[in-house]
Swiss-Prot record:
Pfam families: GIY-YIG, MSV199. This is Putative MSV199 domain-containing protein 146R. SMART domains: GIYc (SM00465). Residues 2-97 form the GIY-YIG domain. CDD domains: GIY-YIG_HE_Tlr8p_PBC-V_like. InterPro entries: GIY-YIG_endonuc (IPR000305), GIY-YIG_endonuc_sf (IPR035901), MSV199_dom (IPR018879).
Length: 245
């Protein structure tokens, strides 16, 4: 098991908050939030943060948990978001961004923090997955954030699995991002998620020469009968769909 953290980002001028999760330090996570807000705000929260000045926001720890997979952490995060995350796109209570005429880059007087930690009720995994895969308001960046842990680990692991900017969506990878159970069902669920968000992918057959580029595909083939191999397909995704928005 490893440690994960649920955090809240508050400001000193209103009661709107952002809920997030991380396996990195809160300091590093907050630093990335501020960098995204200043350089490339692409979501409700970062747009709000940039408008009102990043120095008017502060990050606080809500809960430290022991987790088996990243999905465990995000299931807990989604419950906090449902109850409190007014600046989160997923379940956020600000459907349309309304930015008041506040001065930017000026630290305002600190008000009493609105947020108090309350343990939320945990919802079923399938309910969260259904929301994630059917909610049209979730951007690709937020979709990736839901499943993929911090980028330093993400980049290292994916680079090891990548060939010519493409990655094989193996059973190991699906397990890593939180999928469980039968591999075929895992893969089919993941394909639905990709289609829902218009993310292109390929499916290789056993006679495709590209299969030779992926050691894990060759290992899979070695453990299958000829009849099963001829009917099998291997899901391939462009790595840039994960790394870049």
């Amino acid at each position: 098991m490893r440690k994960g953290y649920i955090y809240v980002i508050e400001n000193n001028f209103d009661n709107h908050v952002y809920i997030g999760s991380t396996v990195d330090s809160l300091e590093n996570r907050f630093r990335r939030h501020k960098a995204d807000a200043l350089k490339r705000p692409s979501c409700l929260f970062h747009t709000y943060m940039k408008k009102h000045g990043v120095d008017n926001f502060v990050i606080k720890l809500l809960k430290e948990v022991e987790i088996i997979s990243i999905l465990d952490l995000h299931l807990l995060e989604q419950n906090f978001i449902k109850d409190y995350g007014t600046l989160n796109t997923l379940h956020g209570k600000l459907k349309n961004l309304e930015i008041n005429d506040k001065p930017t880059n000026v630290v305002l007087s600190k008000q009493t923090p609105f947020f108090t930690t309350i343990e939320p009720n945990i919802v079923k995994t399938e309910d969260v997955l259904k929301e994630i895969t059917t909610n049209p308001s979730i951007s690709l960046k937020e979709l990736i954030d839901i499943f993929i842990e911090e980028e330093q680990n993400f980049g290292t692991i994916l680079n090891e699995m990548t060939c010519q900017h493409k990655i094989y969506i193996s059973k190991k990878l699906l397990k890593w991002i939180g999928y469980e159970g039968d591999y075929k069902k895992q893969r089919d669920s993941f394909k639905k998620l990709l289609k829902r968000h218009n993310i292109d992918f390929e499916e290789l057959k056993s006679n495709d020469i590209e299969c030779e580029n992926y050691p894990e595909i060759k290992v899979d083939m070695a453990n299958l009968s000829n009849g099963v191999i001829s009917q099998s397909k291997w899901l391939i995704l462009n790595i840039y769909n994960f790394k870049y928005i």
